């Protein structure tokens, strides 16, 4: 993994903001070819299409992959690089170690801010949050007079009211004022598919991205990987971009902690089912021309519980928030 070590060293020595000391552990986003922001144009490059948004990845990341007919992006929410490396090495998810030996393990930075709503929008537009406008999990929407949750598309003060911004005239499919990847690919003869859990395929955030995309829900990992294999096998001559998203590692990380054994076990389950139900059963014909990309929207940092950070410990502050 010499390439991985060299790439990490370069990212650690990336340019700093003058006069702003962020500490040694802080990495600035590498928008010049080393970030998830550069993935959409990279997909276009591999499929021999004009790019979308930011430039593609650096040449050393693009060049190894030629004659690509199909790109499958597997996005595991919150899968940090150092945890992936640990889980590859400790027997939790050895399939990715095997694939990396025959491919490339390339460190990429996320975007700023590195939150799901902002990162997924960048992956579907090729634009940074400063350009596409989804600058965080919660946003002040001046035209609607409220702070909104940009995943649920509801006022942050409301509970169990997902999508309620539509009652105020908010149209998620019309919110972004720039082309999205599905529309761009369709214009150049590439069919786009999105496989996500049934519970989120019609979420407001998903509706923002999925114009021109064939969206398919799944209920379990068995459902996901068998459906994906059938999709690939039954359309051998079709040029494809396939988006696979799973949020379980992120959910477990928030609930139990990113380094908890249950979080690792969830990724192990995800990876084993991928290997057994998709990879090992994929025909040689379907493998030919298929590029598989595993990535994440962001990582997670484990924090120690501390009562001073609990709002209940500050009743006077809490009283001023209502």
Where are these regions (language model features)?
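Feature captures the catalytic ectodomains and active-site-proximal regions of enzymes
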Residues: 1-322
């Amino acid at each position: 993994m010499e390439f991985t070590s060299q790439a990490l060293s370069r990212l650690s020595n990336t340019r700093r903001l003058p006069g702003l000391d962020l500490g040694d552990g802080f990495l600035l986003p590498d928008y010049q070819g080393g970030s998830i922001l550069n993935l959409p144009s990279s997909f276009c490059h591999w499929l021999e299409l004009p790019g979308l948004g930011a430039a593609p990845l650096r040449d050393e990341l693009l060049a190894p992959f030629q004659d690509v007919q199909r790109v499958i992006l597997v996005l595991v929410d919150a899968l940090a690089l150092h945890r992936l490396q640990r889980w590859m090495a400790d027997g939790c998810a050895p399939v990715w170690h095997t694939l990396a030996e025959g491919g490339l393990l390339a460190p990429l930075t996320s975007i700023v801010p590195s939150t799901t709503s902002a990162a997924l929008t960048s992956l579907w537009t090729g634009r940074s949050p400063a350009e596409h406008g989804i600058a965080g999990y919660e946003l002040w929407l001046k035209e609607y007079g409220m702070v909104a949750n940009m995943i649920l598309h509801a006022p942050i003060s409301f509970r169990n009211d997902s999508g309620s911004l539509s009652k105020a005239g908010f149209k998620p499919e019309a919110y972004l004022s720039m082309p999205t990847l599905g529309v761009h690919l369709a214009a150049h003869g590439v069919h786009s598919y999105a496989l996500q859990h049934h519970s989120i395929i019609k979420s407001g955030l998903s509706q923002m991205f999925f114009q021109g995309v064939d969206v398919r829900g799944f209920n379990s990992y068995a459902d996901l990987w068998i459906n994906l294999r059938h999709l690939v096998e039954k359309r051998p001559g079709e040029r494809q971009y396939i988006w696979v998203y799973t949020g379980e590692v992120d959910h477990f990380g928030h609930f139990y902690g990113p380094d908890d054994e249950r979080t690792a076990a969830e990724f192990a389950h995800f990876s084993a089912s991928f290997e057994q139900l998709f990879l090992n059963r994929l025909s040689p014909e379907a493998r030919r021309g298929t590029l598989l990309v595993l990535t994440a929207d962001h990582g997670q940092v484990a924090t120690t519980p501390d009562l001073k950070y609990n709002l209940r410990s500050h009743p006077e502050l809490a009283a001023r928030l209502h």
